From Swiss-Prot:
Family: Belongs to the glucagon family.
Tagged with keyword S-adenosyl-L-methionine: no
Renumbered residue ranges of the record's region Disordered: 1-35
Species of provenance: Myoxocephalus scorpius (Shorthorn sculpin)
Gene Ontology annotations for the cellular component aspect, listed alphabetically: extracellular region
Biased composition (Basic and acidic residues): 1-12, 19-30
Protein's name in the database: Pro-glucagon
Induction and repression of expression: Produced in the A cells of the islets of Langerhans in response to a drop in blood sugar concentration.
Listed InterPro entries: Glucagon, Glucagon_GIP_secretin_VIP
Main location class: secreted
The entry's keywords: Cleavage on pair of basic residues, Hormone, Secreted
GO terms of molecular function: glucagon receptor binding; hormone activity
Top-level taxon in the UniProt lineage: Eukaryota
Gene3D superfamilies: 6.10.250.590
Length: 96
């Protein structure tokens, strides 16, 4: 009789644990979906703000030259970083 009571108590505990997992799964999914949607919204908003900033600053010709120089500098930095990564990868592989 004692074993039957223990068994039914364990079954009830398993059922409660299963229900808790089922309840937390949709919550985690909905939180993840919200975070993903909100991140996409923020990314779109930043892009819109950037385009608006470009439109507003395009009126000044001096700003266009600065933007070109900034772009060139950013590309140069990226290419330099990429060359360093490639060199380190070759060092690791023993090809140098």
């Amino acid at each position: 009789l004692q074993d039957a009571e223990d068994s039914s108590r364990f079954d009830a505990d398993d059922t409660l644990a299963g229900e808790a997992r089922e309840l937390s799964t949709p919550k985690x999914h909905s939180e993840g979906t919200f975070s993903n949607d909100y991140s996409k919204y923020l990314e779109t908003r930043r892009a819109q703000d950037f385009v608006q900033w470009l439109k507003n600053s395009x009126x000044x010709x001096x700003x266009x030259x600065h933007a070109d120089g900034t772009f060139t500098s950013d590309v140069s930095s990226y290419l330099n970083d990429q060359a360093i990564k490639d060199f380190v990868a070759k060092l690791k592989s023993g090809k140098v």
